[in-house]
């Protein structure tokens, strides 16, 4: 009887590791499928942002340069109104959810509304003033500023390879700018301000999303809502509102279609930016924007109508483009390695706990 008891006890002890091994294998499969879904969502969010960012630059350029619409402020105002209207209707239909307004909302959003307003208006103004190739190459300064912002706000560090590719992009931008025959000082100043605001906005959006107080829809809604009246007041006192009302192109159906698309794309781009930042990072969002800018650079050379070719400018543009491609590859590779090491360390910890 004692022998039988010992055998049963030994059998039970032998089964425990097998059960533990099976359980661990199931956990590994579950984590692998979750990892695949996460990567897919990240790529989808990045692709959505890239397409949205491309379309809004092309449409805004057409409205402000080709049709010579006189007010960047009023285009920005239209984008804010469209954002608020779409999200308000979405909330009423229970398609989206975000917190109702209370006295703590301004504190929870600050300083994003100011950054959003500045980012939007400087972006529109520089789009109007600069040809598309120079607009896109100067936008690469936003990567440098994003690195600073994430370093200060999110305490991130960057590898030597990342720093060198950013340096190459900036050198390329300086070379291209040195022989820009269509040089416009106001355009250059506004695009550099826009780069700083883009970097700060991306880092703060990531910080606010991590706190989970308002969510992505709440941030979008209140950013636009808080800046409608200030933008309207600025447009009125600067005379931009009157210029927009006096514009002769309102009777043109094609212009109306593009203006409406510009307003709606403003909301879509805001949503895509927050979505990409949420699933990836502020830096990844900036990278996707730069890859999109490569396409816009070459399209702008051929179809933009305001690009003046010089070899020095062309070489500078391509140095910056090459730097952005290598930069994107290094950043993506580093991010994947980081995720894999985190996943393996979690598995090791769980494996030790199961033994």
UniProtKB/Swiss-Prot annotation:
Catalytic activity as recorded in UniProt: UMP(out) + UDP-N-acetyl-alpha-D-glucosamine(in) = UMP(in) + UDP-N-acetyl-alpha-D-glucosamine(out); UMP(out) + UDP-alpha-D-glucose(in) = UMP(in) + UDP-alpha-D-glucose(out)
Record-level Gene Ontology MF annotations: antiporter activity; nucleotide-sugar transmembrane transporter activity; UDP-glucuronate transmembrane transporter activity; UDP-N-acetylgalactosamine transmembrane transporter activity; UDP-N-acetylglucosamine transmembrane transporter activity
Residue spans, topological domain Extracellular: 60-68, 178-184, 238-253, 304-314
Major localization listed first in the record, in broad terms: Golgi
Protein function: Nucleotide sugar antiporter transporting UDP-N-acetylglucosamine (UDP-GlcNAc) and UDP-glucose (UDP-Glc) from the cytosol into the lumen of the Golgi in exchange of UMP. By supplying UDP-N-acetylglucosamine, a donor substrate to heparan sulfate synthases, probably takes part in the synthesis of these glycoconjugates.
Gene Ontology CC annotations of this record: endoplasmic reticulum; Golgi apparatus; Golgi membrane
Sequence ranges on the Cytoplasmic membrane side: 1-38, 90-156, 206-216, 275-280, 336-355
PANTHER family, sorted: SOLUTE CARRIER FAMILY 35
InterPro entries associated with the record: Sugar_P_trans_dom, TPT_transporter
Alphabetically ordered keywords of this record: Antiport, Golgi apparatus, Membrane, Sugar transport, Transmembrane, Transmembrane helix, Transport
Region named Disordered: 1-27
Alphabetical list of Pfam families matching this protein: TPT (PF03151)
One GO biological process term: embryonic skeletal system development
Protein's name in the database: Nucleotide sugar transporter SLC35D2
Bilayer-crossing regions: 39-59, 69-89, 157-177, 185-205, 217-237, 254-274, 281-303, 315-335
Localization in the cell: Golgi apparatus membrane
Biased composition (Basic residues): 1-11
Family that this chain belongs to: Belongs to the TPT transporter family. SLC35D subfamily.
The keyword rRNA-binding appears for this protein: no
Membrane topology: Multi-pass membrane protein
């Amino acid at each position: 009887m004692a022998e039988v008891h010992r055998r049963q006890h030994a059998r039970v002890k032998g089964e425990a590791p097998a059960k533990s091994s099976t359980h661990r294998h199931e956990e590994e499969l579950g984590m692998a499928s979750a990892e695949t879904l996460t990567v897919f969502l990240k790529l989808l969010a990045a692709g959505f942002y890239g397409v949205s960012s491309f379309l809004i630059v092309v449409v805004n350029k057409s409205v402000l340069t080709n049709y010579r619409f006189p007010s960047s402020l009023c285009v920005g105002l239209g984008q804010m109104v469209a954002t608020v209207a779409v999200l308000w209707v979405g909330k009423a239909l229970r398609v989206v959810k975000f917190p109702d307004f209370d006295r703590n909302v301004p504190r929870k959003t600050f300083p994003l509304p100011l950054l959003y307003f500045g980012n939007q208006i400087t972006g529109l103004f520089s789009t109007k003033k600069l040809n598309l190739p120079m607009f896109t190459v100067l936008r690469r300064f936003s990567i440098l500023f994003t690195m600073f912002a994430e370093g200060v706000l999110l305490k991130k560090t960057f590898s030597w390879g990342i720093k060198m590719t950013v340096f190459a992009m900036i050198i390329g931008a300086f070379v291209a700018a040195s022989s820009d025959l269509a040089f416009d000082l106001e355009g250059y100043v506004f695009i550099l301000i826009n780069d700083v605001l883009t970097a700060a906005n991306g880092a703060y959006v990531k910080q606010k999303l991590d706190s989970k107080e308002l969510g992505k829809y709440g941030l979008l809604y209140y950013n636009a809502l808080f800046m409608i009246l200030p933008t309207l007041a600025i447009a009125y006192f600067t005379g931009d509102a009157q210029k927009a009302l006096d514009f002769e192109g309102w009777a043109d159906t094609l212009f109306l279609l593009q203006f409406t698309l510009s307003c709606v794309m403003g909301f879509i781009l805001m949503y895509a930016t927050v979505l990409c930042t949420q699933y990836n990072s502020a830096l990844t969002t900036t990278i996707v924007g730069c890859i999109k800018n490569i396409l816009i650079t070459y399209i702008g050379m051929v179809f933009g109508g305001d690009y003046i070719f010089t070899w020095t400018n062309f070489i500078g543009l391509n140095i910056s483009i090459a730097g952005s491609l290598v930069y994107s590859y290094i950043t993506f590779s580093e991010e994947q390695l980081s995720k894999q090491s985190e996943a393996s360390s979690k598995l090791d910890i769980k494996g030790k706990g199961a033994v």
